[in-house]
UniProtKB/Swiss-Prot annotation:
Protein's name in the database: Hemoglobin subunit alpha-5
Function: This is a larval (tadpole) alpha-globin.
Lineage, top ranks: Eukaryota, Metazoa, Chordata, Craniata, Vertebrata
GO CC terms, sorted: blood microparticle; haptoglobin-hemoglobin complex; hemoglobin complex
GO MF annotation: an example: oxygen binding
Residues reported in the UniProt entry to bind O2: 59
């Protein structure tokens, strides 16, 4: 899927603001995911899932940094996320539906932290972008 120049600009602009807060944004998105969809906790039984835990901050940061990697390689997301796709499909065996749930939690978190920047156009671009990221992550499940 290709992105228009306006979509690329919206994604890059917001990523510029998010990139300095990856652990916080990621932890909050994961907390939101786990509160809204408790069944997603099953993959994290070895984590301390309490509010603000080191585990949530660390893993949340990794998630958001991976999204940042995709954002900075927006013209070749499959290559940028290839190793991560392998990990989720072959080792972790995460339910593919969880990526859509996490994408929603991330968008809500972005909207809360960056209300002026996360306008309708930015939301549409990020929704499309995260859908592509999710599709890439589940592409090796087949």
């Amino acid at each position: 899927m290709t992105f228009s120049s306006a979509e690329k600009a919206a994604i890059a602009s917001l990523w510029g603001k998010v990139s300095g807060h990856t652990d916080e944004i990621g932890a909050e998105a994961l907390e939101r995911l786990f509160l809204s969809y408790p069944q997603t906790k099953t993959y994290f039984s070895h984590f301390d899932l309490s509010h603000g835990s080191k585990d949530l901050r660390s893993h949340g940061g990794k998630v958001v940094k991976a999204i940042g990697n995709a954002a900075t390689h927006i013209d070749d997301i499959p290559h940028a996320l290839s190793a991560l796709s392998d990990l989720h499909a072959f080792k972790l065996k995460v339910d593919p539906g969880n990526f859509k749930l996490l994408s929603h939690a991330i968008q809500v978190t972005l909207a809360i932290h960056f209300p002026a920047e996360f306008n309708a156009d930015a939301q549409a671009a990020w929704d499309k972008f995260l859908a592509v990221v999710s599709a890439v992550l589940v592409s090796k499940y087949r």
